[in-house]
């Protein structure tokens, strides 16, 4: 470890040990990258995402309160409905019209159950393929949720719901328009394998199952947006960071802490996932156009070239912005970018500058390429040095 790196760690420790955290100083340090040693990144993210307050003295009580609240969410939205499902229609004599699966009432328990299953199946499909370049999400967590996995419990878990649902032979997708599409697979095709569940023994669960639970709870608590594909790519790096915290006391509560940090982050970016807001000033279309207007201001030649080739920002910047660049770089590089995004006062204005910097750093290739070549460049971004990209974005910010 270099003396410079040791000095940076000491600077973070000095800020974080104060009774009242100096937020501006923490932002300044974090913007240049947060060391992963000693759980510094995990702690800084929790502060920068407004999960932990600046007053250290209140941390213990707030964490206890939030973690108990999350446990209550699990009981209300997974355990109790699971018990109700297990009990619904057990005895033919006990079945009421309200309990009947064919009850057309949209507020009936069965109708709610079926709608939840549609959301759950989409989440399940998406979280299974999280970060396929690493094995982390397929491995067992050291801290499985005992509330869910207690062998004494006799209720339908999310795992059982996915295995048993009558919709499992269908592909269910909810797009940003809020439309749910279902299509049965071809007779000869193999449905999505559920054997991944069998890899881990009873009492264990994979990290992706934890992420599935977080997203399901979020969808239940936020019915206006529920779950939209891509949210898994936002929660994944958060959970990975917290679940690999070297401090076991923090790592043990990675699920609850991730949920609340994800919720706070989504409060800032959720408009990107709502199609009806696309053309508003808070919508994704406005932000994509802002990338191009910034490019026009900083590099008019490149801007005109992209315009001439009719390369619209929707073709590439939609994914860049909506998923916070989580699909453009390897996970460690995404985490480094997020250090700067979370640390910046106007973090999602800075994201626009990062996108503009990405364009300018490959300007020569773009100026020389035709439409096909340039689309390939933009959809499979060639530069892997994220520090170079962040430095360029900071230059753009400082030159305003």
Curated annotation (Swiss-Prot):
Residues 35-345 form the Rab-GAP TBC domain. Keywords: Cytoplasm, GTPase activation, Membrane. The keyword Cytoplasm applies. One of its GO terms (cellular component) is cytoplasm. Pfam families: RabGAP-TBC. One of its GO terms (biological process) is intracellular protein transport. It is found in: Membrane; Cytoplasm. Acts as a GTPase-activating protein for RAB35. Together with RAB35 may be involved in regulation of insulin-induced glucose transporter SLC2A4/GLUT4 translocation to the plasma membrane in adipocytes. Interacts with RAB1A and RAB10; in a GTP-dependent manner. This is TBC1 domain family member 13. It comes from Homo sapiens (Human). The gene is TBC1D13.
């Amino acid at each position: 470890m270099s003396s410079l790196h040791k000095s940076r760690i000491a600077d973070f420790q000095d800020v974080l040990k104060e009774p009242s955290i100096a937020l501006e100083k923490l932002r300044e340090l974090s913007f240049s990258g947060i060391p992963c040693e000693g759980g510094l990144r995990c702690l800084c993210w929790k502060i920068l995402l407004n999960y932990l307050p600046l007053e250290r003295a209140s941390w213990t009580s707030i964490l206890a309160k939030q973690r108990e609240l999350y446990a209550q969410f699990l009981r209300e939205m997974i355990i109790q409905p699971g018990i109700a499902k297990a009990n619904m229609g057990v005895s033919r004599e006990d079945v009421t019209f309200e309990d009947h699966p064919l009850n057309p009432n949209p507020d009936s328990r069965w109708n709610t159950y079926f709608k939840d299953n549609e959301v759950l199946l989409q989440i399940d499909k998406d979280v299974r393929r999280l970060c396929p370049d690493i094995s982390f999400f397929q491995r067992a967590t050291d801290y499985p949720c005992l509330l869910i996995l207690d062998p004494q419990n006799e209720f339908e878990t999310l795992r059982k719901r996915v295995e048993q649902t009558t919709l499992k032979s269908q592909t269910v997708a909810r797009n940003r328009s809020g439309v749910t599409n279902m299509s049965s697979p071809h007779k000869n095709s193999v449905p999505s394998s559920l054997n991944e569940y069998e890899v881990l023994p009873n009492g264990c669960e994979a990290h992706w199952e934890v992420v599935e639970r977080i997203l399901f709870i979020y969808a239940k608590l936020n019915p206006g947006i529920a779950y939209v594909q891509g949210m898994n790519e936002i929660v994944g790096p958060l959970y990975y960071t917290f679940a690999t915290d070297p401090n076991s006391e923090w790592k043990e509560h990675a699920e609850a802490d991730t949920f609340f940090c994800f919720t706070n982050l989504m409060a800032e970016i959720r408009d990107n996932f709502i199609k009806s807001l696309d053309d508003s000033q808070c919508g994704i279309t406005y932000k994509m156009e802002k990338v191009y207007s910034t490019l026009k201001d900083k590099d008019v030649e490149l801007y005109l070239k992209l315009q001439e080739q009719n390369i619209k920002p929707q073709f590439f910047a939609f994914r860049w912005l909506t998923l916070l660049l989580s699909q453009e770089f390897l996970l460690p590089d995404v985490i480094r970018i997020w250090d700067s995004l979370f640390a910046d006062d106007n973090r999602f204005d800075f994201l626009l500058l990062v996108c503009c910097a990405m364009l300018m750093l490959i300007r020569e290739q773009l100026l020389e390429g035709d439409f096909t070549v340039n689309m390939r460049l933009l959809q499979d971004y060639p530069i892997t040095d994220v520090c170079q990209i962040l430095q360029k974005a900071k230059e753009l910010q400082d030159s305003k």
